[in-house]
């Protein structure tokens, strides 16, 4: 009987190994989901003031001081894609008080970097003093850019 038990031992060991469940294969390596790059939202880059612009709508000679009869240009650089609504609010500034001089809005579909212009003129002459132009983007209550300038 002892010999039979000893003879069965190796067979049982082999049988046990054959019945052993194999481990599941490792999961396939994960791949990162493809990233979708959204185009940048419209934004205001720079605002340059001057009394003349070129065909590219850029101010030819930047200035922050103007004569009483000057036409004052604000060249506004934008970037990004999508619908853009730019509003220029020109104001006379005296201490803490401001008085609106002019307000102009333009709308366009932006396909990338662009330059737009706003301007104000007063043929009878600007009163001497401090002024500012605020550029608003897409109905935001906060100006995207503000530039101050003097007349006189």
Where are these regions (language model features)?
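Sec-dependent bacterial lipoprotein signal peptides
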Residues: 1-17
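Serine/threonine-rich low-complexity intrinsically disordered regions
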Residues: 1, 28, 93-97
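Contiguous segments within soluble domain cores/interaction surfaces
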Residues: 38-128, 134-147
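Bacterial signal peptide processing site
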Residues: 18-22
């Amino acid at each position: 009987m002892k010999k039979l038990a000893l003879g069965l031992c190796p067979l049982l060991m082999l049988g046990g190994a054959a019945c052993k469940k194999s481990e599941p294969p490792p999961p396939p390596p994960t791949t990162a989901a493809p990233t979708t790059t959204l185009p940048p939202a419209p934004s205001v880059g720079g605002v340059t003031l001057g009394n003349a612009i070129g065909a590219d709508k850029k101010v030819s000679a930047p200035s922050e001081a103007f004569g009483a009869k000057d036409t004052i240009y604000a060249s506004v650089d934008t970037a990004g894609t999508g619908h853009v609504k730019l509003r220029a609010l020109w104001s006379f500034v005296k201490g803490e008080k401001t008085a609106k001089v002019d307000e102009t809005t333009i709308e366009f579909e932006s396909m990338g970097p662009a330059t737009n212009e706003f301007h104000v003129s007063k043929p009878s002459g600007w009163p001497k003093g401090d002024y500012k132009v605020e550029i608003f983007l897409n109905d935001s209550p906060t100006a995207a850019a503000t530039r101050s300038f003097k007349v006189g």
